[in-house]
Amino acid sequence: MFEEMIVEKVRKEAERIAEKQGLEIFDIQYRRESRGWVLRVVIDNPVGYVSVRDCELFSRELERFLDREDLIEHSYTLEVSSPGLDRPLRGPKDYQRFTGKLAKIITKDGKTFIGRIESFVDGIVTISDEKGKHEIDIEDVRKANLEIEF
């Protein structure tokens, strides 16, 4: 409960900062780990990729807010990062945004598809691999993420 309260208060300010910097909040977590409490904020750039500089500027501004508001009584580590090159795909906007990119989709019945996202229309993602095109209803997706290309 305490952790959820912290996350919600941080989320409001984080969203304000992100919007000002042309970014979005991908995820926020606050939890105890083996090394202590960690406040993890994952930022995203809706029109490209997140740079180290984006993380640095966002982190500085969020730190100022956290110091000023003194929301967290004990010591903690603030981590600001991007979703990564193998980022999860979490909904229609992601499938549309990453059309043409290599992705891995695991369905609820255990099938795995690795291929290029061809399209996303009416809740159906079309992915093509060496065997052809596959249409997958996103309601049937258990897990999906981009694959790193070399």
UniProtKB/Swiss-Prot annotation:
**Which is one Gene Ontology cellular component term of this protein?**
cytosol
Q: Main localisation, per the record?
A: cytoplasm
List the coiled-coil residues. Answer: none
Pfam families attached to this UniProt entry: DUF150_C, RimP_N
Task: Specify whether Signal is a keyword of the entry.
Answer: no
BP terms from Gene Ontology: ribosomal small subunit assembly; translation
What CDD domains does the annotation carry?
YlxS_C
State the UniProt keywords alphabetically. Answer: Cytoplasm, Ribosome biogenesis
Q: Where would you find this protein in the cell? A: Cytoplasm
Q: List the disulfide bonds.
A: none
Q: Give the UniProt family note.
A: Belongs to the RimP family.
Q: Which NCBIfam families match?
A: PRK14638.1
Function, as annotated, reads: Required for maturation of 30S ribosomal subunits.
Q: What is this protein called?
A: Ribosome maturation factor RimP
Query: Which species is this record about?
Result: Thermotoga neapolitana (strain ATCC 49049 / DSM 4359 / NBRC 107923 / NS-E)
